[in-house]
């Protein structure tokens, strides 16, 4: 089974604490690493995770609050000291490129690799990354400044050929690609062999949605409907609902409601306010509405399993 893992580097919010690093994650899909947000200390957590720096080529920044991007310059500089040669792509709002370019020119001149900014409009849902096995799409969110989440979607792979049936019907090799892609096969006598006799369905494609930071926003449900794993911020308990609304954040109960209505398979909550020394109240409030809820914590790794159709 191909890897599809989410590694939690940090799960705190804006105020640094001794318990949590700022929210940051790495998604490992088939040994390609994708970082989501890069708060202060993210590179130290990346080292602890034992993930290979050389496989991290894409970083996605949800918005321009410091707890989501203050770690970028340090990480970029470290890559340079390690002699990196592969291009690093930073997917972000255009403002971040304008902010970081002078710093790169000052601190990172003459590095052995290129940093390329690929900008997007956070208010628009669009595919911003596409390869042969994966797409990454923005999820417009509502925060105090322009913000988006990210939807990671595997592409459906072709069905698996049944070698025994191919041999039985003496089907030539040049027909196999058509059959893998869903075609039936016509025998020399005109009889049609249906595709489902010649193939075994491949596993269903997996999806992961990352939604932080945002006010309670039901209109994201259509875009994230049915995902295998949803990370949703749960900055506050329900007793702080007014504060959550004022600061454009979400309560744990509201995160649970989003997960339940969107019929996701599993909910992971994070971006915890520093006021909570024990986040069990947040887990309880989310679980009361959506039982299959996990509490994010540093070093947590979640594997999204393949599901047979």
Swiss-Prot record:
<comment type="similarity">
    <text>Belongs to the RNase Z family.</text>
</comment>
<feature type="binding site">
    <location>
        <position position="213"/>
    </location>
    <ligand>
        <name>Zn(2+) 2</name>
    </ligand>
</feature>
<keyword id="KW-0378">Hydrolase</keyword>
<keyword id="KW-0862">Zinc</keyword>
<comment type="subunit">
    <text>Homodimer.</text>
</comment>
<feature type="binding site">
    <location>
        <position position="143"/>
    </location>
    <ligand>
        <name>Zn(2+) 1</name>
    </ligand>
</feature>
<feature type="binding site">
    <location>
        <position position="68"/>
    </location>
    <ligand>
        <name>Zn(2+) 2</name>
    </ligand>
</feature>
<dbReference type="GO" id="GO:0008270">
    <property type="term" value="F:zinc ion binding"/>
</dbReference>
<dbReference type="GO" id="GO:0042781">
    <property type="term" value="F:3'-tRNA processing endoribonuclease activity"/>
</dbReference>
<feature type="active site" description="Proton acceptor">
    <location>
        <position position="67"/>
    </location>
</feature>
<feature type="binding site">
    <location>
        <position position="67"/>
    </location>
    <ligand>
        <name>Zn(2+) 2</name>
    </ligand>
</feature>
<keyword id="KW-0255">Endonuclease</keyword>
<keyword id="KW-0819">tRNA processing</keyword>
<feature type="binding site">
    <location>
        <position position="65"/>
    </location>
    <ligand>
        <name>Zn(2+) 1</name>
    </ligand>
</feature>
<dbReference type="InterPro" id="IPR001279">
    <property type="entry name" value="Metallo-B-lactamas"/>
</dbReference>
<protein>
    <recommendedName>
        <fullName>Ribonuclease Z</fullName>
        <ecNumber>3.1.26.11</ecNumber>
    </recommendedName>
</protein>
<feature type="binding site">
    <location>
        <position position="213"/>
    </location>
    <ligand>
        <name>Zn(2+) 1</name>
    </ligand>
</feature>
<dbReference type="InterPro" id="IPR013471">
    <property type="entry name" value="RNase_Z/BN"/>
</dbReference>
<feature type="binding site">
    <location>
        <position position="63"/>
    </location>
    <ligand>
        <name>Zn(2+) 1</name>
    </ligand>
</feature>
<dbReference type="InterPro" id="IPR036866">
    <property type="entry name" value="RibonucZ/Hydroxyglut_hydro"/>
</dbReference>
<keyword id="KW-0479">Metal-binding</keyword>
<dbReference type="Pfam" id="PF12706">
    <property type="entry name" value="Lactamase_B_2"/>
</dbReference>
<feature type="binding site">
    <location>
        <position position="271"/>
    </location>
    <ligand>
        <name>Zn(2+) 2</name>
    </ligand>
</feature>
<comment type="function">
    <text>Zinc phosphodiesterase, which displays some tRNA 3'-processing endonuclease activity. Probably involved in tRNA maturation, by removing a 3'-trailer from precursor tRNA.</text>
</comment>
<keyword id="KW-0540">Nuclease</keyword>
